[in-house]
Amino acid sequence: MYSLPSQAMRPLSLSPCLTRSSYLRFRILSSLSLPPIFHNSQTRLSFSKNYTRPHLFIRNCTSITAKPSSEFNRNRTQDAPDEKLRALRELFSRPGVNIDAYIIPSQDAHQSEFIAECYMRRAYISGFTGSAGTAVVTKDKAALWTDGRYFLQAEKQLSSSWILMRSGNHGVPTTFEWLNDVLAPGGRVGIDPFLFSSDAAEELKEAIAKKNHELVYLYDLNLVDVIWKESRPKPPNKPIRVHALKYAGLDVASKLSSLRSDLVDAGSSAIVISMLDEIAWLLNLRGSDVPHSPVMYAYLIVEMDRAKLFVDDSKVTPDVMDHLKNAGVELRPYNSILSEIKSLAAQGAQLWLDPSSVNAAIMNTYEIAIEKYLTSNNNKKSKTKMHTDTTGQSGGPAGVFRTSPIAFSKAVKNSAELEGMLNSHLRDAAALAQFWVWLEEEIHNGAKLTEVDVADKLLEFRSKQSGFLDTSFDTISGSGANGAIIHYKPEPGKCSVVDSKKLFLLDSGAQYVDGTTDITRTVHFGEPTAREKECFTRVLQGHIALDQAIFPQSTPGFVLDAFARSSLWKIGLDYRHGTGHGVGAALNVHEGPQSISFRYGNMTPLVEGMIVSNEPGYYEDHAFGIRIENLLYVKEVGTPNRFGGVSYLGFEKLTFVPIQTKLVDLSLLSAAEIDWLNNYHSQVWEKVSKSR
């Protein structure tokens, strides 16, 4: 860790004689001009502004003219014919293919959010580089679906050959609704079954069958790979490393023993694991195959008396080989997973398969092989045996279909993992403190810095911290209107210069050997408008409300989502993304099963030891974006009562980086909210100024 320059951070002094309107401009970080907010404890704040009725998500004001994104889409000029689409469509009539439409998802064979460059097929065919989206190509049309985080980015990146489908907006069809509408009845829709989860493939199959369409599994070739040809990047081949026990907190033998107990309880003889972070966590291994995520491409099958890791053995170092042997794990070639599934089925193995993550190629291979096994044993029943889990869901033939037990175990951090997360966050905070000092000095000295320049400099500061490995996602460095693109990625030669007269949003994170960070701050290097301050303050109020939430055990995350939106809702504003996601310990920056979101389907309870982000925001299209993000971990809290005999939970902060207070409209804050901000900044000074 690096100590901070003595002039960069100064202790706070809370003086009770100062009022809210008369507060000292001490600075926690000179780069942000961050004054503590003082108040007279005898005075209460009240809302004093009269608000006009909002129009949709954007309230009219004299300084901002925001156009709907659909208008920008209509005004796109016609591009030259898309040669990639032409080449792809030529393959539709190839023998053994014979399809009318082809679907290209974002995922790899493991349903990863971040994927190796060689698997970025949807980005290659469409030009849209956001992490979430699905492309559908027919013989005469091409459409791309993405969610609200990426509407503006997709508008910029898609050519006129593509139709942008804004998922979630009123009147926008789903992929299968669109296919049912544009294809003549009896069409054939092709997919690469390795790139769809079993659940997703079954849903698609059932939906298009309503118009008598057939879902065609193209096992032997991916059509995008065919046209990508030699220019397609090579698969990653970097070495795997052992994740030290002092960071993991639990050895592999203990984790496998617990998993095997789950197999016994489920009536299963083996489990197939395809999620890369689950494999890395279970085996205490880390890799470098996927950008920003310390994982390696592999499958894992755990049986009652053995385990098999399907991986490119050129990545396996002698240390890793010894580590695996000691845990009783054998190596198999990565591409032999289907043959192993067939072999286990031929023995009548009852496999545990998570249909939400295991790909359709594996699932379909298992089902076909089990049918053969039953036939060879003269068991020709019209309906094969099904196992049902505790939720009443049924699985495939002789299989146990339910959520992987590893996801929940991984989400509940042990003491060593929490310690590593806290330590890495303090080192990260020290790097950010130095970065913000540098950035404000540069801006005030008139330097012309692009959004990429800023992101690169932040990486430079972080890389000097001990244990630094990589960024945990592409840094979102957005000035002005670019900040409204929720997952904006600045590109060299195409990005903006950081404007001192506009809001600047910086969402970034890092991978350290002992932890994973994710933090967003929004700042202004000049004088913010009243509108910007109001929006920022309401986002801050939502952030504070969630941070202070106390809730009974077994509460799912969606119950808390409204805490973060309430202040925005009061004036008719909102944001189009979830409020919180799980975060891995030295693993993926986004992990499940927990979340805090307006989507009601996730009933996973928040449990002591889980980590979630707290990141409300507000975005005015083509104007500005605001987001404030800390990471929190769930802890038990003492309450004077325990209604129903249950424990109550709350949050503890992992992130300690100042929040720019000149963006705060004091008239909107309560005394308690002011206290929270002052206390938080006191903690920042106390913890980060001592970092080494």
What would you call each of these model-derived segments?
Residues Y2-R692:
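Active-site neighborhoods and metal-handling regions in enzymes and metal-associated proteins
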